[in-house]
């Protein structure tokens, strides 16, 4: 069968890429081997435009948030299930300095639509320096969203659950051939781990391990709380607590160190006897050395693209950046400054060039 696009991977990036291609009436196929543990499947689903550490907006934070909010709201309708909704987030200040910094920005032009001076009152939370509430915050039930996307595309014969190897791809004139299928373009959305034959294996993607706790507590409020860690309500009196960030640990298991780190942070605002641990999970985020996404064209395989490297902000970034990549491919529009994968072309060696020539001949 002839397709316009092959999408490799059905995590957050691949799912959103499929939904964006659907808007453009493109013929596409998503392939994914359905690994049990991925960063997308254990993602907490928190979305907001802020970097709390310095009380600044993330890179293009408000623009990305506004577009993503519209995108996921529409997805609720398309997928016939509400997996996304706006949800109040309260920042518990860690010092009077942070409190003053927040309040000084509330009425400024840059933050007037993002920060609120409203303070919430909590009976069971240690909150000596006060708190502030975001005007823009939301959560996505990532597991349910991915499941719904898979079902949606299975019904349209746009999804196959199978493993993928670049060794099975051959060049057939203008097209890429996989089995009996032909594709004009390939978009790799595979997360942090590449096999040695992947044409984008030259890129400096850094797996960043994150671990979360699932806890139960009758004392936590039905708000997203942030103070060193986040607490996100899920169902009834259950919450997700997270997350850790570790570039060095590549072990595929949960760790005691991560559990202790999360407990030490949550105890700063919630006494340990006020909650119990139900479960612990881990995943690996795809991060980059300059903390910017990896989006764009392969140096020599001109119809091969990558959509990756969004780390813990894929829920925030992927909708708008996915739209930009599709418009870049179809209409030759420019990508956002700083995300184009061409900034790492100097990593592409003669050895990588030889590998790519073997893959497509």
Where do the model's predicted regions map?
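Dinucleotide-binding Rossmann-like beta1-alpha1 core, especially the glycine-rich loop
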Residues: 45-124, 128
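Beta1/beta-strand and adjacent pyrophosphate-binding region of the FAD-binding site
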Residues: 1-13
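Short beta-strand to alpha-helix junction loop
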Residues: 55-67, 97, 132-148, 253-258, ...
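Glycine-rich FAD pyrophosphate-binding loop
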Residues: 22-41
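Helical element adjacent to the flavin cofactor pocket in flavoenzyme catalytic cores
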Residues: 132-185, 189
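C-terminal catalytic lobe of FAD-dependent flavoproteins
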Residues: 278-361
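Active-site substrate-recognition segment that forms the wall
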Residues: 13-24, 46, 51, 82-85, ...
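Short hydrophobic core segments
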Residues: 6-8, 181-193, 322
């Amino acid at each position: 069968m002839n397709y316009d696009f092959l999408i490799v991977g059905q995590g957050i990036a691949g799912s959103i890429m499929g939904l964006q291609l659907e808007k453009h009436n493109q013929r596409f196929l998503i392939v994914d081997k359905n690994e049990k543990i991925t960063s997308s499947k254990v993602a907490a689903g928190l979305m907001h435009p802020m970097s709390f550490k310095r009380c600044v907006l993330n890179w293009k934070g408000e623009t990305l948030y506004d577009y993503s909010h519209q995108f996921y709201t529409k997805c609720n309708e398309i997928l016939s299930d509400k997996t996304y909704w706006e949800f109040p987030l309260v920042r518990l200040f860690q010092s009077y300095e942070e409190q003053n910094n927040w309040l000084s920005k509330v009425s400024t032009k840059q933050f007037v639509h993002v920060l609120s001076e409203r303070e919430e009152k909590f009976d069971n939370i240690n909150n000596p320096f006060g708190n502030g509430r975001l005007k823009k915050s939301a959560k996505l039930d990532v597991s349910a969203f991915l499941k719904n996307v898979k079902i949606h595309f299975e019904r349209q014969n746009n999804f196959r659950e199978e493993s993928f190897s670049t060794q099975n791809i051959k060049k057939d004139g203008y097209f890429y051939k996989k089995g009996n299928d032909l594709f004009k373009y390939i978009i790799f959305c595979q997360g942090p781990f590449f096999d040695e034959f992947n044409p984008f294996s030259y890129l400096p993607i850094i797996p960043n391990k994150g671990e979360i706790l699932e806890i139960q507590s009758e004392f936590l409020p039905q708000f997203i709380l942030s103070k060193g860690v986040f607490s996100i309500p899920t169902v009834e009196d259950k919450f997700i607590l997270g997350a850790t960030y570790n570039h060095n640990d590549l072990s595929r298991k949960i760790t005691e160190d991560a559990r202790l780190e999360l407990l030490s942070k949550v105890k700063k605002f919630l006494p340990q006897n006020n909650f119990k641990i139900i479960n612990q999970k881990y995943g690996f985020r795809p991060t980059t050395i300059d903390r910017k996404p990896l989006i764009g064209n392969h140096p020599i395989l001109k119809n091969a693209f990558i959509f990756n490297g969004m780390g813990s902000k894929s829920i925030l970034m992927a909708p708008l950046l996915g739209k930009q990549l599709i418009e870049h491919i179809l209409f030759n529009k420019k990508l956002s400054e700083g995300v184009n994968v061409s900034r790492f072309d100097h990593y592409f060696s003669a050895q990588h060039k030889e590998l790519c020539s073997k893959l497509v001949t």
